[in-house]
Amino acid sequence: MYIERLQKKIGYQFANLDYLLQALTHRSAAAKNNERLEFLGDSILNYAIGQALFERFPQANEGELSRMRATLVREQTLAILARQFDLGEYMKLGAGELKSGGYRRESILSDCVEAIIAAIYLDAGMDKASERIYAWYQTLLDEMKPGDAQKDPKTRLQEFLQGRRLKLPEYEVLDIKGEAHNQIFKVSCKIETFTDIFIGIGTSRRKAEQNAAEQILLKLNK
């Protein structure tokens, strides 16, 4: 069953599959959708990441902790997790959202991740939800440092490469879909460290480039 593949990707098997199915349902598709779950999941995510940062950085002040948390729970970061799980393939969207490429939109993807967090919480409790969050965020948490959170992914990638006297990243717009007020950009990014080409998607060229850069940083564990 297709939903089994998703459960393997997120690392959790639901006792009550209805929670997961609701988490995957966008408001454009049904009255019983993931909006309330997204609200709850947002709170759970902020708590879990806040606790992790508090324990990992005993010397960091409140402002540094807040900035690091904001970086980890922002829409861009959640959308990257969503793409790692291929959530767009499993989401239930209305006809209009499907036509406009809603399954690629960062806001919809990030909301779905938060809804899944809430679904796990309702299915198995806070400990299990926190466990999954920490597993998904392991690399990002390990590499997070006070001060780095204020720098965007493109800046961090550029500084990483410059520090090793490597060529700067090459970005290229591959595709633009949608009307002027509702466009989806697809951008490629390549660096000499990898033969792979990384693809970023966003609602602007800048966001797409940031998305691609963040994927490279995850690959570099930086």
Curated annotation (Swiss-Prot):
Catalytic activity: Endonucleolytic cleavage to 5'-phosphomonoester
Cofactor: Mg(2+)
EC number, as in UniProt: 3.1.26.3
SMART domains, A to Z: DSRM (SM00358), RIBOc (SM00535)
Domain RNase III: 3-125
Any one of the GO BP annotations: tRNA processing
Subcellular location: Cytoplasm
GO terms under cellular component: cytoplasm
Enzyme active site: 42, 114
Domain DRBM: 152-222
Gene Ontology molecular function: double-stranded RNA binding; metal ion binding; ribonuclease III activity; rRNA binding
Binding site for Mg(2+): 38, 111, 114
Keywords: Cytoplasm, Endonuclease, Hydrolase, Magnesium, Metal-binding, mRNA processing, Nuclease, RNA-binding, rRNA processing, rRNA-binding, tRNA processing
Subunit organization: Homodimer.
Primary role: Digests double-stranded RNA. Involved in the processing of primary rRNA transcript to yield the immediate precursors to the large and small rRNAs (23S and 16S). Processes some mRNAs, and tRNAs when they are encoded in the rRNA operon. Processes pre-crRNA and tracrRNA of type II CRISPR loci if present in the organism.
Family: Belongs to the ribonuclease III family.
Protein name: Ribonuclease 3
